[in-house]
């Protein structure tokens, strides 16, 4: 779509024909400023929270090591969003289960699948051979398994953690999806039906912790066998964390208003709250409050720069901006048009603020890792702009190679680690800068998920070719065929990601850092599930954000 807009270049006004995104305005405006004076848990809530935590800790410690009770308790604690309180206890229990895995692989379908999933989820590679006992002579899963609904659901969740070459898990996934869909209309247990419906769309492997926690608390409350201590602790903890997150968003909203970018850059998506939601999906724990704010600021600028390259900037302007980013010096802004000067100077200011904040911990040198990744992202955006203006449709190989940069996920991973403390060492930053396979798989997943749901709208306004157009052009297939193939490619990259998760040396790259990579990928799965929910947040994402960041659990 072409639009005549008046823009300022140098020191005089000129009329330039530009594309328009026609994005809807922010849905939230000043809403979160109302929480500026919000206080955390009062003394009574803090005491209640600590008391409940200790009760749950005792339950966890006292549960017999080799029991289904222990497995189900760990699973419930994690699904209720409480796992971060008991990391050492859970780690110890799962380490024990890993060393005694053969003893756990002789139970029923539910027990075996649950143990398998909990271990793989934690980074322990265990064999899937235990599921062979549930297949017949032809290698198909036995039909009588459909009577065990709980076991079927557990097998479905376990199979999501498959890697390449695990045919039995590929079959398990197809089998459970088909059977659970058939079972659903016949279930008299509405709570279980709701849980299965949610799982079929949002399996645990893909789940954003805070989103799934809110839903699981509701499911758990409906379960007649729920534990009142666990339920009360989950509700209280959810609300205490939500209060902290509201306060953080209040701070971010104040920062956003101070930037005044909305009036200066009307073409860009104004999505501060959605950016924060993305970062909250990366890590929600209270100790990462500063890290979340840093990541939100950089995410916000990635979005603005993306829109600048995608729909607004002319090639000569984008050339100047790319060169300025490479120089990374305030003097480089002098050659930029006014709107780009504002973006550039504000971006450098944000990084200066982050550097000063990290200087208190003698970690300011780490900022250069994020800056270097920002340069790579901008180079990727510029390459897409050159393809667009040159009317070139790249090959899939060319597009995907560039997609590592344009996904911005190495930049987000690197930035997410900046304020995580001593766990994020220089060795970890050096590692991620080499573009290891687990990170590349994450980049490819986000790139392709985004393209599947956004390419039609982007083509209407005249964007560069997405993966869909590249695939259609290279292989002479229809849009529908390209979609099917790209979905298969995404599934293979998830297998890559799962496989690499087991290979990474967690002494050098601790699990808490790897989870940022995995959680960023999960957010992408959620945001791009049915639509581009980031761009069109008024459709469905608004209600989810309200559940997570506005409305407490009563």
Swiss-Prot record:
<feature type="short sequence motif" description="DDXXD motif">
    <location>
        <begin position="306"/>
        <end position="310"/>
    </location>
</feature>
<dbReference type="GO" id="GO:0000287">
    <property type="term" value="F:magnesium ion binding"/>
</dbReference>
<dbReference type="GO" id="GO:0016114">
    <property type="term" value="P:terpenoid biosynthetic process"/>
</dbReference>
<comment type="pathway">
    <text>Secondary metabolite biosynthesis; terpenoid biosynthesis.</text>
</comment>
<dbReference type="GO" id="GO:0016102">
    <property type="term" value="P:diterpenoid biosynthetic process"/>
</dbReference>
<dbReference type="InterPro" id="IPR005630">
    <property type="entry name" value="Terpene_synthase_metal-bd"/>
</dbReference>
<dbReference type="GO" id="GO:0010333">
    <property type="term" value="F:terpene synthase activity"/>
</dbReference>
<dbReference type="InterPro" id="IPR001906">
    <property type="entry name" value="Terpene_synth_N"/>
</dbReference>
<dbReference type="InterPro" id="IPR050148">
    <property type="entry name" value="Terpene_synthase-like"/>
</dbReference>
<dbReference type="InterPro" id="IPR034741">
    <property type="entry name" value="Terpene_cyclase-like_1_C"/>
</dbReference>
<comment type="function">
    <text>Sesquiterpene synthase involved in the biosynthesis of volatile compounds. Mediates the conversion of (2E,6E)-farnesyl diphosphate (FPP) into gamma-gurjunene, (E)-beta-farnesene and (+)-valencene, and of (2Z,6Z)-farnesyl diphosphate ((ZZ)-FPP) into (E)-alpha-bergamotene and (Z)-gamma-bisabolene as well as beta-bisabolene, (Z)-alpha-bergamotene and (E)-gamma-bisabolene to a lower extent. Can act with a low efficiency as a monoterpene synthase with geranyl diphosphate (GPP) as substrate, thus producing beta-myrcene, (E)-beta-ocimene, limonene, terpinolene, gamma-terpinene and (Z)-beta-ocimene.</text>
</comment>
<keyword id="KW-0456">Lyase</keyword>
<dbReference type="InterPro" id="IPR044814">
    <property type="entry name" value="Terpene_cyclase_plant_C1"/>
</dbReference>
<feature type="binding site">
    <location>
        <position position="306"/>
    </location>
    <ligand>
        <name>Mg(2+) 2</name>
    </ligand>
</feature>
<keyword id="KW-0460">Magnesium</keyword>
<feature type="binding site">
    <location>
        <position position="310"/>
    </location>
    <ligand>
        <name>Mg(2+) 2</name>
    </ligand>
</feature>
<dbReference type="Pfam" id="PF03936">
    <property type="entry name" value="Terpene_synth_C"/>
</dbReference>
<dbReference type="InterPro" id="IPR008930">
    <property type="entry name" value="Terpenoid_cyclase/PrenylTrfase"/>
</dbReference>
<feature type="binding site">
    <location>
        <position position="458"/>
    </location>
    <ligand>
        <name>Mg(2+) 3</name>
    </ligand>
</feature>
<dbReference type="Pfam" id="PF01397">
    <property type="entry name" value="Terpene_synth"/>
</dbReference>
<dbReference type="GO" id="GO:0009753">
    <property type="term" value="P:response to jasmonic acid"/>
</dbReference>
<feature type="binding site">
    <location>
        <position position="310"/>
    </location>
    <ligand>
        <name>Mg(2+) 1</name>
    </ligand>
</feature>
<protein>
    <recommendedName>
        <fullName>Terpene synthase 17</fullName>
        <ecNumber>4.2.3.73</ecNumber>
        <ecNumber>4.2.3.47</ecNumber>
        <ecNumber>4.2.3.106</ecNumber>
        <ecNumber>4.2.3.-</ecNumber>
        <ecNumber>4.2.3.54</ecNumber>
        <ecNumber>4.2.3.81</ecNumber>
        <ecNumber>4.2.3.15</ecNumber>
        <ecNumber>4.2.3.114</ecNumber>
        <ecNumber>4.2.3.113</ecNumber>
    </recommendedName>
</protein>
<comment type="similarity">
    <text>Belongs to the terpene synthase family. Tpsa subfamily.</text>
</comment>
<keyword id="KW-0479">Metal-binding</keyword>
<feature type="binding site">
    <location>
        <position position="306"/>
    </location>
    <ligand>
        <name>Mg(2+) 1</name>
    </ligand>
</feature>
<dbReference type="InterPro" id="IPR036965">
    <property type="entry name" value="Terpene_synth_N_sf"/>
</dbReference>
<dbReference type="InterPro" id="IPR008949">
    <property type="entry name" value="Isoprenoid_synthase_dom_sf"/>
</dbReference>
């Amino acid at each position: 779509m072409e639009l005549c807009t008046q823009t300022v270049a140098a020191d005089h006004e000129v009329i330039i024909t530009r594309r328009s995104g026609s994005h809807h305005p922010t849905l939230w405006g000043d809403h979160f400023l109302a929480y500026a004076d919000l206080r955390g848990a009062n003394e009574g809530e803090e005491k209640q929270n600590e008391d409940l935590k200790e009760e749950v800790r005792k339950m966890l410690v006292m549960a017999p090591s080799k029991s289904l009770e222990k497995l189900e308790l760990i699973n419930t604690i994690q699904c209720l969003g409480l796992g971060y309180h008991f990391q050492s206890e859970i780690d110890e229990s799962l380490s024990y289960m890993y060393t005694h895995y053969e003893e756990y692989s002789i139970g029923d379908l539910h027990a075996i699948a649950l143990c398998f999933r909990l271990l793989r989820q934690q980074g322990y590679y265990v064999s899937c051979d235990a599921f062979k006992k549930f297949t017949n002579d032809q290698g198909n899963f036995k039909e009588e398994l459909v009577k065990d609904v709980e076991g079927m659901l557990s097998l479905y969740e376990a199979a999501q953690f498959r890697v390449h070459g695990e045919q039995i898990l590929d079959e398990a996934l197809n089998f459970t999806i088909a059977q659970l869909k058939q079972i659903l209309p016949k279930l008299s247990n509405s709570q279980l039906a709701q849980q299965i419906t949610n799982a079929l769309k949002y399996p645990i492997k893909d789940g954003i912790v805070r989103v799934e926690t809110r839903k699981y608390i509701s499911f758990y409350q409906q379960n007649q066998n729920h534990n009142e201590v666990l339920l009360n602790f989950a509700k209280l903890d959810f609300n205490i964390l939500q209060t902290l997150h509201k306060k953080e968003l209040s701070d971010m909203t104040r920062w956003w208003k101070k930037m005044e970018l909305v009036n200066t850059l009307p073409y860009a998506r104004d999505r501060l709250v959605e950016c924060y939601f993305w970062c909250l999906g990366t890590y929600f724990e209270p100790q990462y409050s500063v890290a979340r704010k840093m990541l939100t600021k950089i995410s916000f600028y990635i979005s603005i720069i993306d829109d600048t390259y995608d729909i607004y900037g002319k090639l000569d302007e984008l050339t100047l901006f790319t060169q300025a980013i490479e120089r990374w010096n305030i003097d480089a802004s002098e050659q930029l048009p006014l709107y780009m000067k504002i973006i550039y100077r504000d971006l450098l200011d944000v990084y200066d603020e982050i550097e000063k904040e990290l200087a208190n911990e003698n970690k300011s040198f780490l900022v250069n890792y994020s800056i270097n990744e920002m340069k790579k992202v901008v180079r990727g955006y510029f390459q897409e702009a050159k393809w667009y203006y040159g009317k070139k449709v790249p090959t899939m190989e060319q597009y995907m190679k560039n997609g590592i940069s344009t996904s911005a996920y190495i930049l987000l991973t690197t930035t997410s680690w900046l304020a995580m403390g001593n766990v994020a060492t220089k060795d970890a930053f050096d590692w991620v800068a080499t573009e290891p396979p687990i990170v590349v798989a994450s980049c490819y997943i986000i790139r392709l998920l985004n393209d599947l749901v956004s390419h039609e709208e982007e083509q209407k306004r005249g964007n560069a070719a997405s993966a869909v157009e590249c695939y259609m052009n290279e292989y002479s297939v229809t849009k529908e065929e390209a979609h099917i193939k790209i979905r298969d490619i995404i599934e293979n990259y998830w297998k890559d990601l799962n496989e690499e998760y087991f290979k990474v040396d967690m002494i050098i790259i601790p699990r808490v850092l790897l989870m940022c990579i995995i959680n960023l990928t999960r957010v992408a799965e959620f945001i791009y599930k049915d639509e581009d929910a980031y761009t069109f947040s008024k459709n469905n994402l608004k209600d989810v954000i309200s559940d997570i960041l506005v409305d407490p659990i009563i």
